[in-house]
């Protein structure tokens, strides 16, 4: 039986190769592509995601502060209209859920930029995310949002045309939103959106 030895008389094994490809950008620095630790691309994406998230959180905090001031003014308006404290609280809570949860859920949007999102909120997101969603709460939330945007129109934050478009959207889509909510809350119906 013969053994193959290298020049030193020991058997020499090759170190198993690590996954990834080393590309030499210059004669000293290797850029590693693949899955050897964290590649530069992964580090860059990770760093960018962290930076983006921090910026998003800062923007959301700023918007929440602005929203609190808007809500205070909105509540003052409702008090001047001599609404009952319970009604005022309901309107405030409905609007706060829309502006501080929905509009900040995926992106940092201010209420003036979110007026076009009312249909997506009422016809889908609210139904799925609010455990208290019923056809009745759909109607009361739509009323709250219209009152809030009427308040923003009085402050010249949105145009009368935007408010009129919202009024039409609510008038036309409210029955559909309520029907979707009823279907969603019925566990026997799979196509709660009514798309089939």
What is the meaning of each model-derived region?
Residues 2-196:
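Charge-rich, intrinsically disordered N-terminal extensions
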């Amino acid at each position: 039986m013969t053994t193959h030895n290298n020049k030193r008389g020991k058997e020499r094994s090759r170190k198993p190769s690590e996954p990834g490809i080393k590309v030499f950008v210059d004669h000293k620095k290797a850029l590693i592509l693949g899955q050897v630790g964290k590649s530069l691309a992964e580090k860059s994406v990770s760093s960018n995601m962290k930076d983006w998230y921090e910026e998003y959180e800062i923007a959301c905090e700023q918007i929440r502060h602005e929203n609190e001031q808007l809500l205070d003014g909105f509540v003052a308006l409702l008090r001047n209209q001599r609404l009952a404290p319970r009604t005022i609280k309901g309107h405030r809570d409905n609007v706060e859920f829309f502006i501080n949860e929905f509009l900040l859920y995926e992106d940092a949007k201010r209420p003036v930029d979110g007026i076009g999102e009312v249909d997506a909120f009422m016809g889908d997101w609210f139904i799925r995310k609010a455990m208290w969603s019923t056809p009745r709460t759909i109607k009361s939330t739509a009323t709250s949002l219209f009152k809030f945007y009427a308040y923003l129109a009085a402050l010249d934050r949105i145009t009368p045309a935007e408010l009129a478009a919202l009024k039409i959207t609510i008038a036309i889509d409210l029955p559909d939103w309520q029907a979707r909510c009823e279907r969603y809350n019925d566990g026997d119906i799979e196509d709660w959106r009514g798309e089939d």
